[in-house]
UniProtKB/Swiss-Prot annotation:
The gene is ruvA. Residues 64-142 are annotated as: Domain II. Keywords: Cytoplasm, DNA damage, DNA recombination, DNA repair, DNA-binding. Residues 143-155 are annotated as: Flexible linker. HAMAP family: DNA_HJ_migration_RuvA (MF_00031). This is Holliday junction branch migration complex subunit RuvA. It is found in: Cytoplasm. Has three domains with a flexible linker between the domains II and III and assumes an 'L' shape. Domain III is highly mobile and contacts RuvB. It comes from the Bacteria. GO terms for biological process: DNA recombination; DNA repair.
Amino acid sequence: MIAKLKGLIDSLGDDWAVVDCNGVGYLVACSSKTLARLETGTAAALFVETQVREDAISLFGFLETGERDWFRLLTTVQGVGAKVALAILSVASPDQLLQIIAAQDKAGLTRANGVGPKLAVRILTELKDKAGKIALGGFSPGGIKDALSASAPLPAASGRMEDAVSALVNLGYKRLEAFQAVGETARELGDEADSSALIRAALKHLGKGLLG
């Protein structure tokens, strides 16, 4: 089982890289975000997920363990194979995926090749409990590892947050940006803030461009 490759980038393609490790070239499939950070002729270290089948051994490479862990998490969803998981990671970083899933933002997933509305809903539904509470509480260095074992429902306070998010969406904001604004203001105002207070504060954040 190959877990990590360290060597020179021999060549790059649309969805792959060849890593030269002491004269042996390994073909590694990567997301476009990972490929954009690699350069032919330079040294690189890739964390690797190995998939063994009867007819092939496939390697998937990632510059960070967080992206690799998301790849593993995504492929637990029925209908999400390695190719689709990489397509999703090509349009959203691990932190962005946490936000997308916690916000139940279907549009954020359907941007990826191979992800239609039905599959997007399945991904959001199956991963919500694992990723949602991490995004609501802010990101931590081990966030996705915690999410992999998380089974607790979202906090009770999420009801007021969901009301605030829905109100902002009705005002024309995208669901993801509304979720980010409400999450930020909820952390600032604390548990005492009701949905109306969250809406007012979130609108100030959105109006001042304080997010992102």
